């Protein structure tokens, strides 16, 4: 049953969301605005901290600790903020506009321009390797760094950052992921698989991170589209995907029998008819001007989609009917994100 908390107007000109992201286990959401940054518990949705900070742009938090990283909107400065001490513990001048920012207990990874910079988290604070040239797409989680190739944008590199080794960035694996440029990469929580999609948006592929072997190839649809976000379930068994067709798809990674296939798959030997489709999907109701969202898994069968333009968080339940052997998605709750 869908329950609704009060919905705020679509346009928030006075205090728009500048940036937002979930922490590493997706249990918290951090949001920056022109006035402050705020941290929320994702489920149930509740603001747990607010800090006046009119200069915060791109922002990330380290697990559920007191450490927050953000980039100034006025200057290319990376701040590491200690929320217990209510002060910066360090600042670093950057060379270009930041595309993305990733935190672990050992490293801070910053993608800016056409390079990735890696810093050691702690004291002393220093850059620990030469900048890595890349093709504009990257992800860092569980000590693994995945980034698109500088020259062939359909290929990705997967490498592990070594904390104690003399060579921080290992040799890694080169994966030929797509014919078109890679749009997005997502690591699962174990770090043994990476999901990729291209700018074409029709196919999502899953590869093993240790050897680059293709595990699954999913078809989102036939028409070209742009993938907005995709995330792994906590146990790594499912992958949720939202595109600008504004449909939420859920794919089964381990049990391929659960994914749908075309009725002509046994009759026509064409790749399209052999494709694996999502186990279920949900058509999202999107208002005019909504062009962004992010997914978080709150359990292996529960999801949240955050809509920054509308300041809303929708909670979904993934259900299974044992008698009919079918999955379906149910919208359970819609909450306002208070700022």
From Swiss-Prot:
Task: Spell out the residue ranges that the record assigns to WD repeats.
Answer: 177-217, 222-261
Task: Please state where this protein is localized.
Answer: Vacuole membrane; Cytoplasmic vesicle membrane
Principal subcellular localisation of the protein? membrane
SUPFAM superfamilies linked: WD40 repeat-like
Q: Is Zinc-finger a UniProt keyword of this protein?
A: no
Q: Where does it sit, as one GO cellular component term?
A: cytoplasmic vesicle membrane
Q: Does the keyword Repeat apply?
A: yes
UniProt keywords (A-Z) are: Cytoplasmic vesicle, Membrane, Protein transport, Repeat, Transport, Vacuole, WD repeat
Q: Give the matching PANTHER family.
A: WD-REPEAT PROTEIN INTERACTING WITH PHOSPHOINOSIDES WIPI -RELATED (PTHR11227)
Q: Which family does it belong to?
A: Belongs to the WD repeat PROPPIN family.
The entry's function note states: Involved in mitochondrial or peroxisomal functions and amino acid signaling pathways.
What is recorded about the protein's domains?
Answer: May contain a beta-propeller domain involved in specific binding to phosphatidylinositol 3,5-bisphosphate (PIP2), leading to the association of the protein to the membrane.
Q: What is this protein called?
A: SVP1-like protein 2
List the source organism.
Kluyveromyces lactis (strain ATCC 8585 / CBS 2359 / DSM 70799 / NBRC 1267 / NRRL Y-1140 / WM37)
């Amino acid at each position: 049953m869908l329950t609704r908390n009060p919905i705020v107007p679509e346009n928030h000109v006075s205090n728009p969301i500048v940036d937002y992201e979930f922490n590493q286990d997706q249990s918290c959401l951090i949001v920056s605005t022109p006035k402050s940054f705020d941290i929320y518990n994702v489920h149930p949705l509740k603001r747990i901290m607010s800090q006046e900070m009119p200069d915060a742009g791109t922002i990330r938090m380290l697990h559920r600790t007191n450490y927050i990283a953000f980039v100034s909107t006025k200057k290319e400065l990376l701040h590491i903020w200690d929320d217990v001490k209510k002060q910066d513990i360090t600042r670093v001048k950057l060379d270009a506009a930041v595309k993305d920012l990733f935190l672990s207990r050992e490293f801070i990874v910053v993608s800016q321009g056409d390079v990735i910079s890696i810093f050691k988290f702690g004291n002393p604070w220093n850059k620990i390797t030469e900048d890595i040239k890349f093709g504009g797409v990257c992800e860092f989680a569980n000590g693994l760094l995945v980034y698109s190739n500088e020259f062939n944008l359909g290929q990705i590199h997967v490498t592990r950052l070594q904390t104690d080794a003399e060579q921080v960035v290992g040799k890694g694996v080169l994966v030929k992921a797509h014919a078109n440029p890679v749009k997005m990469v997502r690591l699962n929580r174990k770090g043994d698989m990476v999901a990729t999609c291209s700018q074409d948006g029709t196919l999502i592929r899953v590869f093993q991170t240790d050897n680059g072997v293709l595990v699954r190839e999913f078809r989102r649809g036939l028409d070209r589209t742009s993938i907005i976000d995709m995330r792994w379930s906590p146990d790594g068994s499912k992958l949720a995907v939202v595109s600008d067709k504004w449909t939420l798809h859920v794919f089964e990674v381990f049990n391929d029998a659960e994914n749908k296939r075309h009725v002509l798959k046994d009759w026509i030997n064409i790749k399209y008819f052999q494709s694996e489709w999502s186990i279920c999907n949900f058509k999202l109701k999107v208002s005019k001007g909504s062009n962004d969202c992010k997914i978080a898994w709150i359990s292996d069968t529960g999801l949240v989609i955050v809509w920054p333009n509308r300041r809303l968080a929708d909670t979904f339940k993934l259900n299974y009917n044992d008698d009919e052997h079918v999955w379906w998605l149910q919208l359970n709750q819609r909450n306002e994100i208070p700022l």
